[in-house]
Amino acid sequence: GTDFINKGYEHVRYNYDFGNKRHFSFEAFQQAQFNGIQRIDFRHLTGAGLRWNVLENDSLKLWVGSLPMYEYEKLTTGIIERNFRQSSYVLFFVAFKKFEFQTINYYQPRLDYLSDFRFSSSNSIEFGVLSWLRFVTSLDLTYDSAPPAEVPDLVFTFRNAIKLEF
């Protein structure tokens, strides 16, 4: 038979806006994931901090955030790591009538060992074909400066999708 390598995650984020004039919001998040390629049996992240809405309107967004987070990671080898990391990110979004582009980039160094860091980038382009039909292509990259044994330091995913809007 064919062996498949599974991956999955869930992410929940809460934002509280302090008011339009300040352009700051408080956010808290938690995430759980597994990833056979990266040898992650279970990873749980939780954190909270501030986001600065540098620019935001219907067609343009630029957000910058920085949040300390706790990371629990159990590898498929049974090794368990518990670390505190700083999760800093930049999100950029631009939309035109039939085109959207979004990128969000995270830099996450371990607070006690700064040379152990992760960088991830999630990028998508969305084109309107018809008023109810869109084509989406996305590229996700993850770089780990200290990956587990036999795991590549750079992992990427490329996806194409059709989006129906009713």
What residue spans do the PLM features occupy?
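Solvent-exposed loop/turn segments connecting transmembrane beta-strands
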Residues: G1-I5, F34-F42, T76-R82, R110-R118, ...
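Hydrophobic, well-structured mid-protein blocks that either form specific transmembrane helices
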Residues: N35-I79
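Transmembrane beta-barrel strands of outer-membrane/channel proteins
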Residues: A28-A32, A48, V64-Y70, T103-P109, ...
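Repeated loop/turn-to-beta-strand initiation elements of outer-membrane beta-barrel proteins
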Residues: G19-F26, D58-L62, F93-F101, F127, ...
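Membrane-embedded beta-strands of outer-membrane beta-barrel proteins
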Residues: E10-Y14, A48, S88-V90, S121-N123, ...
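Residue-level signature of outer-membrane beta-barrel architecture
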Residues: Y16-F18, A32, W52-V54, Y70, ...
